[in-house]
């Protein structure tokens, strides 16, 4: 019999077959007190085992720890994103840019620079609001810049006639015959335009006594 056992052991070693390890009984599953876990965190030398039933690691001689069932299965916390801040950022990016005010400012600056260059310079930059004055390219020897007075707003009933335009006084036009001959007609047009824009006042009606 002994010879048979020896031959059987030799055959198992030759074939590379090993006996399966004996099943270990989980002290937590075998215990009535299932609220505790047999695990020693501070003993690295002791081997630990994982139980598939209770999903716990346990060690021989481990200390009792008060851990409820499912306590080790922690789900990763998701970061909460503030939706209000995201919506504000998107709304700011989607806002259209107002290019109209920038264009009006640029036109006003170009108009002022044309007068600051020289008193005898040719009129080359005129805003779009005064399109009928574009024929004055050949007029020279204009009045100096001191004789012009600035107007914050031309009372034409239109908001576009604002900020940075110059007005020629009536005395300046009378003293300078060149200006009278060249732009006298245009001044008449301006005055007639101003008169037409003014709303006529309603005259009171008087009822005759019968």
From Swiss-Prot:
Binding sites annotated in the UniProt record for Zn(2+): 26, 29, 51, 54
Matching Pfam families: Zn_ribbon_Dof (PF02701)
GO-annotated biological processes: fruit development; positive regulation of DNA-templated transcription; regulation of DNA-templated transcription; regulation of secondary shoot formation
Main location per the UniProt record: nucleus
One CC-aspect GO term: nucleus
Alphabetic keyword roster: DNA-binding, Metal-binding, Nucleus, Transcription, Transcription regulation, Zinc, Zinc-finger
InterPro entries: Dof, Znf_Dof
Zinc finger (Dof-type): 24-78
Localization per record: Nucleus
Top-rank lineage group of the source organism: Eukaryota
GO function term, MF aspect, one: DNA-binding transcription factor activity
Function of the protein: Transcription factor that binds specifically to a 5'-AA[AG]G-3' consensus core sequence.
Protein name as catalogued: Dof zinc finger protein DOF4.4
Name of encoding gene: DOF4.4
């Amino acid at each position: 019999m002994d010879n048979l056992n020896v031959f059987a052991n030799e055959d198992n070693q030759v074939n590379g077959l090993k006996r399966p390890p004996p099943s270990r009984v989980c002290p937590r599953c075998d215990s009535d007190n299932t609220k505790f876990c047999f695990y020693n965190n501070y003993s690295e030398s002791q081997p630990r085992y994982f139980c598939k039933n209770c999903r716990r690691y346990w060690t021989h001689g481990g200390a009792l720890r008060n851990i409820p069932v499912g306590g080790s299965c922690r789900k990763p916390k998701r970061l909460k994103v503030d939706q209000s801040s995201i919506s504000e950022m998107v709304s700011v990016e989607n806002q259209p840019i107002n290019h109209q005010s920038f264009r009006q400012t640029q036109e006003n600056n170009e108009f002022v620079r044309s007068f600051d260059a020289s008193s005898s310079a040719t009129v080359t930059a005129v805003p779009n609001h005064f399109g009928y004055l574009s024929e004055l390219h050949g007029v020279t020897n204009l009045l100096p810049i001191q004789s012009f007075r600035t107007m914050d707003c031309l009372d034409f009933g239109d908001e576009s006639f604002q900020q940075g335009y110059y007005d020629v006084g009536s005395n300046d036009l009378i003293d300078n015959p060149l200006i009278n001959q060249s732009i006298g007609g245009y001044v008449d047009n301006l005055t007639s335009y101003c008169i037409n824009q003014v709303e006529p006042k309603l005259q009171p009606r008087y009822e005759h006594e019968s």
